């Protein structure tokens, strides 16, 4: 399936050492990861901070690729990210806060993830929840799954609808040119229905690690 799987795309850069770390993101990318992680845990466990919980889940998910295996319990053994803990955090965030970012993360775990067993029906469920709440990557994946009938009954009207929805975002934005072959397979009535289902004022939700910029460090 040609879907967008980006949960593990997490890169650290280096801040100038004299720049004051005002957010957890600053701490994470400036070499003060332990301090940043301590703040994240405190906010997640004591303040029920959704952003802190989400970023903590990302750190567990990407631990092996960002050199966190020597830190606390971020890895299983020496080389593998602690996906179990990441999934636990995302599940709590989804169940307790209806967080669309967490739903997207869970969808990826069921969508051809090497550590967890694939379950396209569950993947579609979480992608759809996320897509309906503004995550562009999920909107693209839902469109793709409707197009190919993966985890859901094939429905080209719904596929076009979700591709069009994603086209309203910074992720897609290619217009109808990329899906004209699908549109050609619809009747005029079906195409009008697909367009009518698009929510033009849907707020875009960012699932990247830069969410940590919203978490103040002090």
Language-model features: locations:
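Sec-dependent N-terminal signal peptides
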Residues: 4-13
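Structural signature of tandem alpha-helical TPR/SEL1-like repeats
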Residues: 31-38, 66-89, 117-126, 153-161
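Short helix-capping/linker turns of helical repeat alpha-solenoids
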Residues: 32, 45-53, 62-67, 71, ...
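TPR/TPR-like (Sel1-like) alpha-helical repeat modules
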Residues: 74-81, 154-174, 195-203
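Terminal, low-structured helical/coil segments at or just beyond the last alpha-helical repeat
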Residues: 173-218
């Amino acid at each position: 399936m040609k879907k967008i799987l980006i949960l593990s795309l997490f890169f650290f850069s280096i801040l100038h050492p004299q720049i004051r770390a005002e957010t957890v993101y600053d701490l994470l990318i400036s070499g003060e990861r332990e301090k940043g992680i301590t703040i994240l845990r405190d906010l997640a466990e004591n303040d029920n901070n959704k952003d802190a919980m989400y970023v903590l889940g990302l750190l567990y998910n990407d631990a092996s690729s960002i050199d966190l295996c020597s830190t606390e319990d971020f890895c299983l053994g020496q080389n593998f990210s602690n996906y179990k803990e990441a999934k636990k955090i995302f599940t709590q965030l989804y169940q307790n806060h209806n967080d669309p970012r967490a739903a997207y993360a869970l969808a990826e775990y069921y969508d051809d993830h090497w550590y967890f067993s694939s379950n396209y029906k569950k993947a579609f469920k979480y992608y759809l929840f996320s897509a309906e709440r503004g995550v562009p990557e999920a909107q693209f994946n839902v469109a793709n799954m409707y197009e190919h009938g993966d985890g859901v009954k094939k429905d080209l009207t719904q596929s076009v609808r979700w591709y069009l929805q994603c086209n309203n975002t910074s992720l897609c934005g290619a217009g109808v040119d990329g899906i004209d072959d699908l549109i050609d397979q619809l009747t005029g009535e079906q195409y009008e229905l697909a367009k009518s289902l698009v929510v033009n004022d849907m707020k875009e939700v960012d699932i990247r690690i830069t969410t940590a910029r919203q978490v103040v460090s002090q």
